[in-house]
């Protein structure tokens, strides 16, 4: 059985990245700073996502109205 080339490359890359992370002495130099950066990234993503929520809600309402109109048209056409 032959292993696909991309799978072999992926295994090598993952193995090397893991070994390099563990081998490097300052891989996790300051866990508090990393946790703070992750929390800040989530807060920024949430702040950017909020203005999109009303647009998504209106698009969903429009799709629902179109589906109802389509079903009404179909029921008149069939029945």
Curated annotation (Swiss-Prot):
Residues 24-51 form a propeptide. It is found in: Secreted. Residues 1-23 form the signal peptide. GO terms for molecular function: toxin activity. The modification Valine amide is found at residue 78. GO terms for cellular component: extracellular region. The keyword Lipid metabolism does not apply. Its main location: secreted. Keywords: Amidation, Secreted, Signal, Toxin. Toxin that paralyzes and kills insects. This is Ectatotoxin-Rm1a. It comes from Rhytidoponera metallica.
């Amino acid at each position: 059985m032959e292993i696909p080339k991309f799978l072999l490359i992926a295994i090598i890359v993952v193995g090397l990245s893991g070994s390099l992370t563990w081998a490097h002495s300052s891989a996790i130099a300051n866990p508090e700073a990393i946790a703070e950066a992750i929390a800040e990234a989530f807060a920024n993503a949430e702040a950017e996502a909020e203005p999109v929520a009303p647009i998504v809600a209106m698009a969903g309402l429009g799709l629902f109205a179109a589906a109802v109109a389509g079903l009404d048209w179909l029921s008149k056409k069939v029945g």
